């Protein structure tokens, strides 16, 4: 897919674009994002974004292919994924965690696991999960925000 003229969405850009529940140099955790507000989202993600749709529906184009986000849809945008919003319902919303390339390079992950996950989401970046699995993902997000709040520097603590 041709990527000329597409804005790159870095961690800093995401921090300024969204209200954040937590952010650092390497990670942004958003509270509920209203997808309808992302009408000019066409961007090339730098890093990896993992999210889950909570309510409503949104039709987005990912690397030129149409996808529909419904409640309990898990989505992963890999490095250099081109994301374009086409249409979103009034109530479409979800949570996202975005990790920077520097952070991903700093952690040690079993290569076999990483490659299998990466290739699994290349062709289909949106996966419908069971309500119980979605609830589990929401609980993990809440736990992350809680733990990060306890350890966050004072400047970030008020953002959590």
Regions found by a protein language model. Give the residues of each.
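A short glycine/small-residue-enriched secondary-structure motif
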Residues: 66-78, 114-119
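Conserved hydrophobic/aromatic beta-strand scaffold that supports enzyme active sites
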Residues: 31, 50, 74-76, 96-98, ...
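Generic protein-terminus/edge-of-domain signal
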Residues: 1-70
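An accessory alpha-helical subdomain
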Residues: 155-160
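A hydrophobic/aromatic-rich effector-binding and dimerization subdomain
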Residues: 2-23, 86-151
